[in-house]
Curated annotation (Swiss-Prot):
<feature type="region of interest" description="Disordered">
    <location>
        <begin position="300"/>
        <end position="471"/>
    </location>
</feature>
<dbReference type="GO" id="GO:0004712">
    <property type="term" value="F:protein serine/threonine/tyrosine kinase activity"/>
</dbReference>
<comment type="function">
    <text>Casein kinases are operationally defined by their preferential utilization of acidic proteins such as caseins as substrates. Can phosphorylate casein on serine and threonine residues, and poly(Glu,Tyr) in vitro.</text>
</comment>
<keyword id="KW-0963">Cytoplasm</keyword>
<dbReference type="InterPro" id="IPR000719">
    <property type="entry name" value="Prot_kinase_dom"/>
</dbReference>
<dbReference type="InterPro" id="IPR011009">
    <property type="entry name" value="Kinase-like_dom_sf"/>
</dbReference>
<feature type="active site" description="Proton acceptor">
    <location>
        <position position="128"/>
    </location>
</feature>
<keyword id="KW-0808">Transferase</keyword>
<dbReference type="GO" id="GO:0005634">
    <property type="term" value="C:nucleus"/>
</dbReference>
<feature type="binding site">
    <location>
        <begin position="15"/>
        <end position="23"/>
    </location>
    <ligand>
        <name>ATP</name>
    </ligand>
</feature>
<keyword id="KW-0418">Kinase</keyword>
<dbReference type="InterPro" id="IPR050235">
    <property type="entry name" value="CK1_Ser-Thr_kinase"/>
</dbReference>
<dbReference type="InterPro" id="IPR008271">
    <property type="entry name" value="Ser/Thr_kinase_AS"/>
</dbReference>
<keyword id="KW-0539">Nucleus</keyword>
<feature type="compositionally biased region" description="Basic and acidic residues">
    <location>
        <begin position="454"/>
        <end position="464"/>
    </location>
</feature>
<dbReference type="GO" id="GO:0106310">
    <property type="term" value="F:protein serine kinase activity"/>
</dbReference>
<comment type="similarity">
    <text>Belongs to the protein kinase superfamily. CK1 Ser/Thr protein kinase family. Casein kinase I subfamily.</text>
</comment>
């Protein structure tokens, strides 16, 4: 496609596609800067790119938020141009043989909580927290985690009046089944607590390699989702976090103790993991597991190589600083062509649900993928036409408790479904919850496989060549 976007962004090769449209590498012909260009047909039944671009504009300036370069209509396409980013955490998780060390998880947790907190301070929920939606930067930003994919984002309060959205039930499950909170499975309107609970599942996924509700078998997709929900509700926090530091139990207990409109104490959650990090004797040197795999000599000076990977070192006397300088020199020698081939932009790892059964069958075949991808207004957005029947559940209240440590509610609500201990309380008289759940791709399906079809070399390997570290 020989096209110049907005008069200055020239399209390069295609690096991804899906129900949302197509993704291309691009270059600013005026500055030579590489960018990511996302195209969506103007004829699509449920356009979402305009909505997503508005969220990008509202979130601009935040650490770990890609810059929106341009949005508009070009020919038959809605077009959004943003920063080009590196591999997703799911890609790096796979690169590290599907298990991350405690040190790496704790370094990630600090940034991940910050990203979610920033989005909440701007008045929006993410509602699809998963490894695919967090990407590492490139070059000097290679240690920075970026949050992407705001297609399911929803405004949860008015920034002027601070009025919180009302508590509701019987909501369709929105997000990705594997990481969705218990209350989301039960059909409760999502709020800040649900983004944080989902983040907790992501951390346990990294530490343990899988979650207890993965790999469940069922005759239909609806039955599969019901089994995921039942398993998640029935799994005590202590079992979920077995053989892991107690701080993770505390994290989940806190998230599940929050009432619907409570403001979480993000500082408390970050402090939990920071204190654990210090107690373990780790150094916050940004030497992640994938860094040690790529540059084993760095692990010898990170002060924690024995806890991360037991790699042999090529030069035990090499300092981390010297390694970083060497790594930057290597990255500096990359040609523009290799950088284009190696970098994978944020949105190529999205697996959004579509509005029709035809689109879903083409882009989603797995049960753990995103379940809804229709852009809402400030209220609820249109849902999928997918119908798998209804699953009735009763709302489950927890016992009464004092105010959360996070501070006052935006408007006190007594509605909570999960007890602070992670168990399930007595069944209430609330209406049953009906969940119509879309089909989706496995979150672990990496978009790198799509990009690899367009190039002879492994794009993840080239993307990792670009990762440079900085203390």
């Amino acid at each position: 496609m020989d096209l110049v976007i907005g008069g200055k962004f020239k399209l390069g090769r295609k690096i991804g596609s899906g129900s949302f449209g197509e993704l291309y590498l691009g270059i600013n012909v005026q500055t030579g800067e590489e960018v990511a260009v996302k195209l969506e047909s103007v004829k699509t039944k449920h356009p979402q790119l305009h909505y997503e671009s508005k969220l990008y504009m509202l979130l601009q300036g935040g650490t770990g938020v890609p810059n929106l370069k341009w949005y508009g209509v070009e020919g038959d396409y809605n077009v959004m141009v943003i920063d080009l980013l590196g591999p997703s955490l799911e890609d790096l998780f796979n690169y590290c043989n599907r298990k991350l060390s405690l040190k790496t998880v704790l370094m990630l947790a600090d940034q991940l909580i910050n990203r979610v907190e920033f989005m909440h301070t701007r008045g929006f929920l993410h509602r699809d927290i998963k490894p695919d939606n967090f990407l590492m930067g490139l070059g000097r930003k290679a240690n920075q985690v970026y949050i992407i994919d705001f297609g399911l984002g929803k405004k949860y309060r008015d920034l002027q009046t601070h009025r919180h959205i009302p508590y509701r039930e019987n909501k369709n499950l929105t997000g990705t089944a594997r990481y969705a909170s218990v209350n989301t499975h039960l059909g409760v309107e999502q709020s800040r607590r649900d983004d944080l609970e989902a983040l907790g599942y992501v951390l346990m996924y990294f530490l343990k390699g899988s979650l207890p509700w993965q790999g469940l078998k069922a005759g239909t997709k609806k039955q599969k989702y019901d089994r995921i929900s039942e398993k998640k509700v029935a799994t005590p926090i202590e079992v979920l976090c077995k053989n892991q530091p107690s701080e993770f139990v505390s994290y989940f207990r806190y998230c599940r103790s929050l009432r619907f409109d409570d403001k979480p104490d993000y500082s408390y959650l970050k402090r939990l993991f920071r204190d654990l990090f210090i107690r373990e004797g780790y150094q916050f040197d940004y030497v992640f597991d994938w860094t040690v795999l790529k540059y084993p000599q760095i692990g010898s000076s990170s002060g924690s190589s024995s806890r991360t990977r037991n790699h042999t070192t090529a030069n035990p006397g090499l300092t981390a600083g010297a390694s970083l300088e060497k790594q930057e020199r290597i990255a500096g020698k990359e040609t523009r062509e290799n950088r284009f081939s190696g970098a994978v932009e944020a949105f190529s790892r999205r697996h959004p649900a579509t509005s029709t059964t035809r689109d879903r069958s083409a882009s989603r075949n797995s049960v753990d993928g995103p379940l809804s991808k229709h852009p809402p207004g400030d209220s609820e957005r249109p849902r999928s036409s997918s119908r798998y029947g209804s699953s009735s559940r009763r709302a489950i209240p927890s016992s009464s408790r004092p105010s959360s440590a996070g501070g006052p509610s935006d408007s006190r609500s007594s509605s909570r479904l999960v007890t602070s201990t992670g168990g399930v309380g007595t069944v209430s008289n609330r209406a049953s919850t009906s969940q119509r759940i879309q089909a989706g791709n496995e979150s672990r399906t990496s978009s790198f496989s799509r990009a690899a079809r367009n190039t002879r070399e492994d794009p993840l390997r080239r993307s990792l060549e670009l990762l440079t570290l900085r203390k």
